[in-house]
């Protein structure tokens, strides 16, 4: 044991000692995993530790699951990779590849997407059937020198004309250009590993010994010479491939092989850029200057650069409406719904099937095909120039033999072998059109399915019962045989179900045989159903409109009936109140106004109310100046009873001409001018019945009853009852012939006469409908005021003989009453202030009753 421990301890101590020695020596520790991990020697414990670490690590990873990339993100990444690859390829191609001084990639004139086939465009440019992408010049001067043209062609800043050109611009061709061209030839041509030896050998034999492709240095092996590695250590697979290829015919060449011609930067002793740009032309579309070797349109022989040519393409697939002649109606209606895409038109003459031809420069530089296709070998452009390597023998300067330069006199067909159309560089236009038609067909089918699902087509339930299984047949049989389905367990009729299955199977078989007919039938049924539904909706809408119109008409009729009933009710109510209505311009209203004025004469109270909206002056006995007792003498006026009521002198009233009182009252109350006679006061001259009212008043004083007229002649709104208004102008109505109050007032006047007092009443023009009014501006100048004094019964002048002949013209019937006339016969005394009586002509119609035609024969004596 002790020996074992000693043997173990030294080993452990040695291990520690070695470890310490390694650390002390400055050398890194052991590199093996077992030396680094002390648990590595213990498999069980170390495995458990690793297992725990794996579980913990896996749990941490599972907590944050990795997000799965979507299809859109993958598409974006793919597009980004392609864009970066295009940029790199563009830079490489500009540095290493060219065709007669032009390039095989676009130069950035247009920034839009390049959706043309780049491989086809590259092939056509190498074959010299389409002009390469020349470097364009924004500006061009005819007097540029050679080194200026070289700088412009290479994209460098244009130096001054007298500036000494740099060596790299106008220097001669470098001696190592052959090595550069040979290295490019090995790098740019198609790899030979993918071709067989026999194919390469046949291709090499097609080249003449004088071809520039064979003018390579001796250090470069021939194209068909195998390398040492392949000759010494050739794999067994290649050996078998060579044996099999010797027996079988060679496979056709998938693509022609590109060859880089010797690099030569000069043509006829001058730089290639100077040779190209010395006669630059401007493209009519992009307005950029290019070498004169541009594409020519096949139709109108106009110049167009390749940058513009590759941008012209067919329009996107669209419906054929409004494009060209109408399509011929075909039996299949679906053909008319197909999308179309017309060929591109010429940008100059707008002729369809746009295509171009190309005349290459007379020299060859850059890339060519080692074995041209038969089409290229026999190709000669429309401008009598060749673009293949089988062209006429080249001169020592590399230029083709000159030929007669002639222009094309006629346009070329779009199918000509020399013409390159826009469809040639975009061969996928037909595939895009088919894809668009397919998408539209799918969309139409989906829309038809949605429409068909929205309606139940007639007759489809019987024809398609087989698709619903056995339960559908059982339901139909139960509906047909209700007696059997009434609770019994009798099985359905097997003959009917089998017949339905046979018919449905036959229908399905016919559908499989003729799907177009079935589809057409379904479309026709759907159209008929949609038409019927449209008609039904139209009829329903029309019925709804008629219902609404009838309802509105009924409402309007009810409304009109209610309105008419309300108007009739109002009219009836007005008729019950007064037989004369509410019109103040009527003859009866004027007669009432006249009666009110006459009544106010006896009562000493005036109420102004005129039909012509003239407001009269109301003068109370307190406002009238009392005359001196004993002035003047009484004069009998018997003519007043005979003159009728032709003038205001025939009325039992007096006038007083107090200028101060009249002017003050006229200033206070200004009347509105009458529309009938704006320069005078309106005295109701159109009312001929006022005189009858005045005569009726006198008749009532001689034995007639005025109570009857007080109830029948009144203002509307009094309801047959008379009421006295206030002197200050209350809106109350009063009777025109209230003789009871008149008798009491006269008795009171008899008492006042004993004390030698007189009441003066103003006889002014008044109206019956207004309490407060104003006189006209000319009333103070045109109206004469008279005063009359009411005397006791011993006065010689009496108002007892008033002509009754005019009473019948008014149509106003006054009832006869018996009253004491001795009380109402006051004495009339004429004062010095009383003016003489004026005839109607002199008065000019200013007094009330001026329209009366009776004559006045009264005379005034003093």
Curated annotation (Swiss-Prot):
Principal cellular location given in the protein's record: cytoplasm
InterPro entries documented for this protein: Sip5/DA2, Znf_C2H2_type
Keyword presence, Cytoplasm: yes
Compositional bias segments (type: Basic and acidic residues): 13-24, 551-578, 751-778
Task of the protein: May negatively regulate the snf1 kinase.
Biased composition (Low complexity): 380-397, 579-591
Subcellular location: Cytoplasm
Compositional bias per record (Polar residues), positions renumbered to this chain: 1-12, 201-218, 465-491, 640-676, 688-724, 847-862
Entry's family note: Belongs to the SIP5 family.
Protein name (database record): Protein sip5
Keywords recorded for this protein, A-Z: Cytoplasm
Stretches the record annotates as Disordered: 1-70, 201-261, 380-415, 465-524, 551-591, 605-735, 750-784, 825-862
Lineage: Eukaryota, Fungi, Dikarya, Ascomycota, Pezizomycotina
Gene Ontology CC terms: cytoplasm
Organism: Sclerotinia sclerotiorum (strain ATCC 18683 / 1980 / Ss-1) (White mold)
């Amino acid at each position: 044991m002790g020996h074992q421990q000693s043997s173990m301890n030294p080993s452990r101590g040695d291990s520690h000692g070695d470890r310490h020695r390694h650390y002390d020596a400055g050398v890194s520790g052991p590199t093996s995993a077992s030396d680094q991990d002390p648990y590595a020697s213990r498999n069980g414990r170390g495995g458990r530790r690793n297992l725990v670490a794996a579980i913990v690590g896996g749990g941490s990873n599972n907590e944050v699951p990795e997000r799965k990339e979507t299809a859109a993100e993958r598409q974006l990444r793919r597009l980004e990779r392609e864009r970066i690859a295009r940029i790199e390829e563009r830079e490489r191609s500009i540095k290493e590849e060219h065709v007669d001084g032009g390039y095989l990639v676009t130069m950035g004139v247009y920034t839009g997407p390049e959706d043309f086939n780049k491989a086809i465009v590259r092939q056509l440019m190498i074959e010299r059937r389409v002009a390469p992408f020349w470097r364009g010049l924004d500006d061009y001067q005819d007097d540029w020198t050679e080194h200026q043209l070289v700088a412009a062609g290479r994209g460098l800043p244009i130096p001054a004309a007298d500036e000494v050109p740099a060596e790299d611009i106008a220097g001669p061709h470098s001696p190592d250009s052959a090595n550069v061209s040979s290295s490019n030839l090995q790098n740019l041509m198609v790899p030979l590993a993918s071709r067989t030896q026999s194919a390469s050998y046949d291709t090499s034999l097609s080249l003449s010994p004088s071809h520039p492709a064979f003018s390579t240095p001796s250090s470069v092996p021939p194209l068909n010479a195998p390398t040492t590695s392949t000759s010494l250590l050739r794999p067994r697979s290649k050996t078998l491939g060579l044996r099999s290829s010797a027996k079988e015919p060679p496979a056709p060449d998938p693509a022609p092989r590109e060859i880089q011609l010797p690099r030569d930067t000069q043509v006829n002793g001058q730089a290639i850029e100077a040779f190209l740009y010395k006669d630059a032309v401007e493209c009519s579309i992009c307005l950029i200057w290019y070498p004169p070797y541009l594409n020519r349109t096949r139709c109108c022989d106009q110049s167009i650069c390749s940058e513009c040519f590759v941008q012209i393409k067919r329009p996107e697939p669209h419906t054929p409406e409004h494009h060209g002649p109408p399509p011929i109606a075909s039996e299949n209606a679906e053909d008319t719904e197909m999308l179309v895409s017309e060929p591109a038109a010429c940008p100059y003459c707008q002729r369809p099937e746009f295509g171009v031809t190309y005349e290459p420069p007379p020299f060859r530089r850059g890339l060519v095909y080692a074995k041209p296709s038969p089409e290229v070998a026999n190709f000669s452009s429309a401008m009598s120039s060749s673009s293949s390597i089988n062209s006429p023998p080249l001169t020592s300067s590399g230029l083709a033999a000159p030929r007669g330069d002639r222009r094309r006199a006629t346009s070329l067909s779009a199918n000509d072998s020399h013409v390159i159309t826009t469809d040639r560089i975009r061969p996928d236009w037909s595939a895009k059109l088919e894809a668009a038609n397919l998408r539209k067909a799918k969309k139409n089918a989906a829309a038809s399915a949605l429409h068909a699902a929205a309606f139940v087509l007639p007759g489809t339930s019987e024809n398609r019962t087989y698709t619903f299984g056995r339960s559908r047949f059982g339901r139909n049989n139960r509906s047909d045989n209700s007696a059997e389905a009434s609770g019994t367990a009798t099985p359905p009729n097997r003959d009917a179900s089998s017949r339905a299955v046979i018919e449905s199977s036959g229908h399905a078989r016919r559908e499989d045989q003729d799907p177009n007919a079935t589809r057409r039938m379904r479309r026709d049924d759907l159209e008929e159903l949609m038409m019927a539904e449209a008609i039904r909706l139209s009829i329903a809408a029309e019925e709804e409109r008629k219902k609404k119109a009838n309802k509105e008409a009924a409402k309007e009729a009810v409304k009109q009936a209610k309105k008419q009933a309300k108007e009739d009710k109002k009219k009836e109510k007005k008729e019950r109140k007064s037989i004369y209505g509410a019109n103040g311009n009527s003859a009866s209203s004027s007669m009432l106004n006249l009666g009110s004025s006459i009544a106010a004469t006896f009562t000493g109270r005036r109420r102004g109310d005129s039909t012509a909206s003239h407001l009269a002056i109301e003068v109370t006995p307190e406002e009238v100046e009392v005359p001196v007792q004993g002035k003047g003498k009484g004069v009998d006026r018997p003519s007043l009873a005979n003159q009728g009521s032709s003038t205001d002198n025939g009325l039992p009233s007096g006038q007083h001409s107090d200028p101060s009182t009249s002017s003050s009252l006229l200033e206070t109350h200004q009347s509105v001018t009458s529309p009938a006679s704006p320069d005078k006061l309106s005295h109701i001259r159109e009312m001929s019945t006022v005189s009858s009212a005045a005569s009726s008043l006198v008749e009532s004083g001689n034995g007639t009853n005025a109570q009857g007229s007080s109830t029948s002649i009144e203002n509307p709104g009094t309801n047959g009852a008379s009421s006295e208004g206030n002197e200050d102008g209350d809106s109350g109505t009063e009777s025109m012939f209230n003789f009871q109050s008149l008798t009491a007032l006269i008795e009171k006047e008899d008492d006042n006469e004993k004390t030698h007092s007189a009441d003066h009443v103003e006889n002014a023009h008044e109206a019956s409908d207004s309490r407060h009014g104003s006189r006209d501006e000319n009333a103070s100048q045109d109206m004469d005021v008279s005063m009359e004094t009411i005397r006791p019964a011993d006065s010689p002048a009496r108002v007892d003989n008033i002509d009754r002949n005019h009473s019948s013209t008014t149509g106003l019937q006054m009832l006869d009453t018996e009253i004491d006339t001795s009380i109402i016969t006051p004495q009339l005394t004429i004062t010095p202030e009383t003016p003489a009586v004026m005839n109607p002509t002199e008065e000019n119609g200013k007094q009330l009753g001026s329209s009366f035609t009776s004559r006045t024969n009264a005379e005034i004596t003093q």
